[in-house]
Amino acid sequence: LPERRMQLLSGMEEGDLFTLKSVAHQLKGAGGGYGYPGLTERAQQLEMACRAEKHAEIPGTLKNLVSYIDQICR
């Protein structure tokens, strides 16, 4: 998860929607498999915002996802 977190932050910094969408998609699948439905939900929200190119929603959904990852990794 720490590596995925860094990829998300780098993608945001670079404005790389493809990376954000791809990493969110990977996390969406992994969350359910490892028993973290909250991770799946937040990753899906980010993936959907990226797919729809809803630029105003992306920072907030990314922040929610990164905060959740931080909670898991504590």
Question: What is the predicted function of each stretch?
Answer:
Residues 22:
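Conserved alpha-helix in the HATPase_c
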